[in-house]
Amino acid sequence: MKKFRMIHHADRATIAAMYEHYAPVFILSTGRAGSKFIVELLNLDARVLACHEPRPTLEYFCDWASRHQEQGDVLGRMIDAARMEMVLEACIQERIFIESNQCLTFFAPALAALFKSAKFVHLVRHPGDFVVSAARKGWHRNDSIWEAGRARLADERRWSAMDQVERLAWLWDFTNRYLRDFLAALPAARRLTCRLEDLLGGERAVMELFTFCGADMPEAGKVTAIQGRPVNTLWVDADEPDNMKKNPAFPAFKDWPAGEREKVARACAATARELDYEL
C-alpha cells in the first residue's frame, strides 16, 4: 500500500486495500457499559485513534437497524457513508482506528461485510448496574433524538405495559444476545468479549484487549490512573429541558427491593449466566 499524507491523495488501490486488509476495531455494547472509559484506556497508545461517539453518531437509526437486518445493502450503504473517510484517514496515517459507539451495534453485520478484516469487541456490564446507569440517564423516559432511535420491542401493546426497569432489562438482554450471536459467526481472531468489571479490576483483561486491538500495552501506572477515576459521569444541566427525565437519585441495584430485582432476573438471567454474572 502506498503512503499518503492526506486523505484526498489516496488512490483507488489504497481504498480497495483499506476495505480488504485494514483492521479497524469496533467496540459494541448496550451503552452505559464503559464505552467512554475504554476509549480513554486505548488512547494511551499513541498509534491508536480511538473515538467514543464520532459524528454522525447514528443514534436515530439504532431501532430501525435492529428491525431491518435483512436489508444488508441499505445498512451497508449507511455505514459506508458514515465511516469510510474516518477509517481511511486512520489507515493512511498507519494508526489503529477504534470506535466504541453503542449506536453501531445493530450495524455490526454491515461493518463486518464492509471492512473485511475488521475486529469486534463485545463490551458487557452487569445487567443490574446497566439498568441503574441507564435509568439515571433517563433512558426509555426521555423525549429526545436518542430515545426516538433506541431499540425497543416491536410489540407496542406489550411495550407500553412495561415500566422503565423492565424496558431496560429487556434492552440489556436483547442487545447482548444479538452481539453474542453475531460474534459466534466470526473467526476467533476477529472477536473478543470483555466485561467492564474485569477491565476495571486488574491488568490481565486490559492486556488481552490491547493485544487483540494490535496496540501496545501502556505503563501500568497510566492504566491504573484511568481505572481509578470516574469516566462519563452523569451531568444534569441547570437549564435541562423538561423533556429530559434524568434521575441521579435512582438507587444502586444492591439497594432495590426483591420485586424490582426480580424484573431484571426474569429478563436477563440466562444471558447473565453465560457472561458469568450473578443476579
Residue ranges of predicted features:
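Hydrophobic/aromatic beta-strand patches that form the interior of the parallel beta-sheet core
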Residues: 25, 49, 119-121, 192-194
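Short His-Asn-centered micro-motif
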Residues: 28-30, 98-102, 124-125, 196
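Conserved phosphate-donor/acceptor-positioning beta-strand/loop module used by diverse small-molecule
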Residues: 114-136
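PAPS-dependent sulfotransferases, especially Golgi type II membrane carbohydrate sulfotransferases
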Residues: 1-25, 158-169, 173-193, 203-279
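Glycine-rich phosphate-binding loop used to anchor ATP phosphates in small-molecule kinases
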Residues: 88-110
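PAPS/PAP-binding and catalytic site of the sulfotransferase fold
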Residues: 34-47, 111-115, 193-218
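Short catalytic/ligand-binding loop motif for oxyanion handling, primarily in non-cytosolic enzymes
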Residues: 36-39, 58-60, 105-108, 128-133, ...
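PAPS-dependent sulfotransferase catalytic core
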Residues: 1-91, 139-141, 243
